[in-house]
Swiss-Prot record:
It holds the Pfam family Aa_trans. GO terms for cellular component: endoplasmic reticulum; endoplasmic reticulum membrane; fungal-type vacuole membrane; vacuolar membrane. Residues 75-97 have a biased composition (Basic and acidic residues). The gene is avt3. This is Vacuolar amino acid transporter 3.
Length: 656
């Protein structure tokens, strides 16, 4: 059999039935489909010429061949409209090229039409099929596309350019002639008009509806694309490939198999941010206010009343400056936190930033686990009849049983209920803490306090930095804003407000309880039923917040290790599940090791994990991207020096 094969089609007899199921009829249908399957750029297109008079197809199908190309899920090529048919010549040597397509063909659609075992089976060979040598080039093309996609999936997909709405493209008469074309056009036009009218009113959406927007901030942690759409169970086979060229979206022609309202596909169009200034302020407040507030009273004891108040204010100012440096760098160099570092300094800087994010998030999660274990231990001791104090390891193990199933959640929006409950409980705990601080000071006065503690003051610096850590959520909030240029002034107001909140809670609680203040200040509350309820609810709030802290670390590690999706390969998916469980076990072990000295552990996390992200990386990025005068360069060098010195000093004092 020659590689270049010509197939001639006889003219049909008048009494021949098209649906007879004969070999020639089926062969004609296959040639008809192949001749109208859009070939990708970079391929030598086979000569496919079909004439209505010479084909073995009925008249209505032949007429449709020259006017309306049949779409099998691929994005239409403009050359389809100009295809005219005469003879059919298929050169199998021209069906393969060294260049892998990246524009028009949808590999998922091609995969559905391939026979044999699953495409993800590494032991599968198309030569084992009947006539495998004839269609081997098709399987080889599919294999090269998959390999090219695996290489591209090695890096996080954090491209932030905006793509225009594909529903706004003009539709031709031939598109309208397709079955369901007029209805499809009507639905698109109506959806477009509704969206335009809603945008014209300018009314903001409901305040952080179901906390989906806040969760999407974690889905784009530090600007990285961490979502796992390719592994969602609601992703169907009509999903657009992740590596499709966005410019070709406008030429998409729906086929008969395409649903009118497609499901949430794997390719997400970047839509402009629509968050108002007020919503951005609330997102910022949620990003900064958390568990660190409850560690501040004990930290004030470590540093002293005056020293701690002044240091907390200075740390807030320095953190604010570094946040602004990162925002300015992002405006100059678009991309995620890691992408900016990779663009300016190369892949090693990108790796360092992502590694710091992973270490910091695992450290936060471990601190949260220790906090929850300590709080639950105190609650159980109060409510039990024997007042028995169980070991912390028991409550840490209970959290392990909770975190394992939650860590297997790949769609972060499914954690919206836990985020809502956690924020409500945290707010109740802070209000209750203020209430008892004021009551205690009014009835008992100021307790025994120290203005400066020269022995343990260095530990306070790490706790203060831990409290202000939220830099990785700045960039995704900026993406969601309708007016990103307003973020610097909004951030200034938010930093002033949370600095006042942190200083007031630390100062009032330390003044109220003095040297008897505990590591978790809510444990200083008087033993009562309502107090136990508040303590328990706050512990549950932090327990439900821990999966959100682990999600970015898990996603970044997965994207660095696995280059293949687990949607169609159960083996890959279970390997990812094992990795997630191992990360949870690592966080559990770290929390168990640091649970005996929780204040020391929190200070260590702030010193080792948070300082590089806040005080070292942003000045370095700003220095290379935006420092165009000696003042800015001096500021960047000063901030980097402060961060490096603080990291070395606090780490040394913590361990030695």
């Amino acid at each position: 059999m020659s590689n270049s094969q010509s197939i001639k089609i006889k003219k049909p007899r008048s009494n021949e039935n098209f649906a007879s199921g004969s070999y020639s009829s089926r062969r004609s249908q296959q040639i008809h489909r192949l001749s109208h399957s859009p070939m990708a750029e970079g391929f030598h297109k086979p000569k496919l010429n079909i004439s209505p008079s010479e084909s073995n197809l009925p008249n209505n199908v032949a007429e449709n061949t020259t006017d309306t190309p049949v779409n099998y899920g691929s994005i239409r090529d403009e050359n389809h409209n100009s295809r005219k048919g005469k003879d059919v010549t298929l050169n199998s040597d021209e069906a393969h090229s060294e260049n892998v397509p990246s524009t028009s063909e949808d590999p998922d659609v091609v995969r559905r039409h391939l026979g044999g075992q699953a495409a993800d089976d590494d032991n599968f060979s198309s030569l084992q099929l009947q006539g495998g040598d004839m269609h081997r080039q098709v399987y080889r093309w599919q294999q090269e596309v998959d390999q090219n996609k695996q290489i591209r999936r090695g890096r996080s997909r954090s491209f932030s350019a905006k793509v225009s709405d594909p529903n706004l493209h003009l539709r031709s008469v031939q598109d309208m002639k397709q079955a369901g074309g007029m209805r499809r056009d009507f639905l698109r036009n109506r959806a477009s008009s509704i969206s335009m009218s809603s945008n014209a009113h300018g009314n903001p959406n409901f305040l952080n509806r179901n906390f989906i927007e806040f969760l999407s901030v974690y889905g784009h942690f530090a600007g990285e694309e961490l979502s796992e759409e390719d592994e969602d169970e609601d992703t169907d086979d009509f999903a657009m490939p992740r590596d499709v060229n966005p410019s070709l979206i406008h030429s998409t022609v729906p086929s008969e198999q395409e649903p009118l309202i497609s499901r949430h596909g794997r390719y997400k169009l970047q839509t402009p941010g629509n968050a108002s200034n007020g919503k951005a302020v609330l997102l910022l407040l949620k990003s900064f206010v958390g568990t660190g507030v409850l560690f501040l009273p004990k930290a004030f004891k470590l540093g002293g009343l005056v020293f701690s108040s002044a240091t907390l204010l200075i740390v807030g100012v320095l953190s604010h400056i570094c946040f602004l440096l990162l925002i300015q760098t992002r405006m100059k160099v678009p991309g995620s936190f890691g992408d900016i570092g990779g663009t300016l300094y190369g892949p090693h800087m990108r790796f360092a930033i992502l590694a710091s994010i992973v270490v910091s998030q695992i450290g936060f999660s471990s601190a949260y686990i220790s906090f929850v274990a300590s709080t639950l231990q105190a609650c159980v001791k109060v409510i039990s009849t024997t007042h028995r104090e169980y070991h912390l390891a028991v409550f840490i193990f209970i959290q392990f049983l909770v975190f394992v199933p939650l860590s297997l959640v790949r769609k972060i929006s499914k954690l919206s209920a836990t985020a809502l409950i956690a924020d409500v409980f945290i707010l109740l705990g802070i209000l209750y803490l203020y209430f008892w601080d004021v009551i205690t000071l009014a009835t008992k006065g100021i307790a025994d306090v120290a203005m400066f503690n020269k022995t343990d003051f260095s530990l306070f610096i790490g706790v203060a930095i831990f409290t202000y850590e939220g830099i990785c959520l700045i960039l995704p909030i900026q993406e969601q804003m309708a007016k990103p240029k307003n973020l610097p002034k909004l951030l200034t107001g938010v930093m002033a407000a949370i600095s006042l909140l942190f200083i007031s809670i630390g100062l009032l609680s330390y003044a109220a309880f003095g040297s008897k203040v505990k590591t978790v200040v809510i444990l200083n509350m008087p033993e009562s039923t309502f107090t136990v309820i508040i303590q328990f609810l706050y512990a549950i709030a932090i327990l439900l917040s821990t999966p959100l802290q682990l999600f970015p670390a898990i996603a970044i590690i997965e994207q660095g290790i696995f280059t293949r999706s687990g949607k169609r390969n159960r083996k890959i998916k279970w390997r990812k599940n094992y990795l997630r469980v191992l990360i949870v076990i690592l966080a559990i072990l770290i929390s168990w090791a640091g649970s005996s000295r929780l204040d020391l552990f929190v200070s260590m996390v702030g010193s080792v994990c948070c300082i590089p992200l806040i005080y070292m990386y942003p000045p370095m990025l700003h220095y290379k991207a935006c420092a165009n005068n000696w003042i800015l360069r001096t500021l960047d060098i000063f901030m980097f020096t402060i961060g490096a010195f603080a990291m070395a000093f606090t780490t040394y004092m913590t361990f030695f």
